[in-house]
Amino acid sequence: MTDSKDHHVAGRKLDHLRALDDDADIDRGDSGFDRIALTHRALPEVDFDAIDTATSFLGRELSFPLLISSMTGGTGEEIERINRNLAAGAEEARVAMAVGSQRVMFTDPSARASFDLRAHAPTVPLLANIGAVQLNMGLGLKECLAAIEVLQADGLYLHLNPLQEAVQPEGDRDFADLGSKIAAIARDVPVPVLLKEVGCGLSAADIAIGLRAGIRHFDVAGRGGTSWSRIEYRRRQRADDDLGLVFQDWGLQTVDALREARPALAAHDGTSVLIASGGIRNGVDMAKCVILGADMCGVAAPLLKAAQNSREAVVSAIRKLHLEFRTAMFLLGCGTLADLKDNSSLIRQ
């Protein structure tokens, strides 16, 4: 990678943050949750205050099944502040957190500070993050181990973003034979590898490739939330290049991705972990995802503005999600996550 491209990567991360602030239509609001109608219980037969939302993830106990999804990598004071606020907020609220892409730290050593977060979140799961396509661009086991080490991570996201790479003029588009390279990383790193999309959804075929590679953790990251394709279009805003706009609604909606994933993982019940993300905006959306089989729910956009503010704002936003999730469980008559999980009887037919 050239110095020019390194600088471009760092600048692009800040461009992404600005685009999220400037364009309300980047949040597509079409993940499919409106298609899921739940059955209200006027006599729920549970004590609200006794509802148990606790769960475990990657060997650590959480207050409820929330993962702060990857938001931003890069370097600079603003990004460092966002990541530290998120990590400290995750620790106080007892939820998991994933960082954004760590690719930049391999070309800009100062970027490591953005990912040195374990001191801020000593007891909750932290996930490192590398773009899977970078395994075809010179990154390998050494870099994956370094990404895990700086974060003292409990797991490693390998993210799949073919659409985002396709609409970037500087994108890395060689996705050939990644399955074998993912398998080698999954075999050789000391923590679980999690395969995730970034907003277009994992299909059953993608999950099958992941399973053959030894992956047991999948984040469907479906369509309907933040459109990275639209962000790339906005970042350039060239009249002769509307590729990102054309593909802004490409992919599997989150609801459909979850429904594909469950049967694909059926043979691995008890050993596989399914994470829902993509347009989850409140605790009711989270409840719907768990009903559809998700073990964890990834949320990013609802926490970004809070993270730009303070740790306290992050904690407040997480507690709001937790209250909404607990209230949905109460109104469905569910006292535990086991009552909610994979329970299609809660969906009105």
Swiss-Prot record:
Mg(2+) binds at E165. GO terms for cellular component: cytoplasm. One of its GO terms (biological process) is isoprenoid biosynthetic process. It holds the Pfam family FMN_dh. Its EC number is 5.3.3.2. Substrate binds at R12, K13, S101, Q102, R103, Q164. It catalyses: isopentenyl diphosphate = dimethylallyl diphosphate. Its main location: cytoplasm. This is Isopentenyl-diphosphate delta-isomerase.
